[in-house]
Amino acid sequence: MAKLRITQIRSGIGGTSNQRATLRTLGLRKINATTVRDDRPEIRGMIRTVTHLVRVEEVDS
């Protein structure tokens, strides 16, 4: 299964509570924090919510 490397590039401060909760659910708490997740529709939906705050790269599993 493909993997996604998700890096937080902007702060969640000033965003909606939903955006801040989504960052936490993805495992991102600080700027430049990185997490690797499976490429699933649920994760893609979370990324869509905070697309302006994160950078997403596909990585080989």
From Swiss-Prot:
User: Tell me, what is an example of a GO biological process annotation in this record?
Assistant: translation
* TM spans (from-to): none
Q: GO CC annotation: what is one?
A: cytosolic large ribosomal subunit
> Between which residues do disulfide bridges form?
none
Q: Does the keyword Ribonucleoprotein apply?
A: yes
| A Gene Ontology molecular function term of the record | structural constituent of ribosome
User: What does the UniProt keyword field contain?
Assistant: Ribonucleoprotein, Ribosomal protein
Assembly and partners are described as: Part of the 50S ribosomal subunit.
In which family does this protein belong, per the annotation? Answer: Belongs to the universal ribosomal protein uL30 family.
What's this protein's name?
Large ribosomal subunit protein uL30
Which source organism does the UniProt entry give? Frankia casuarinae (strain DSM 45818 / CECT 9043 / HFP020203 / CcI3)
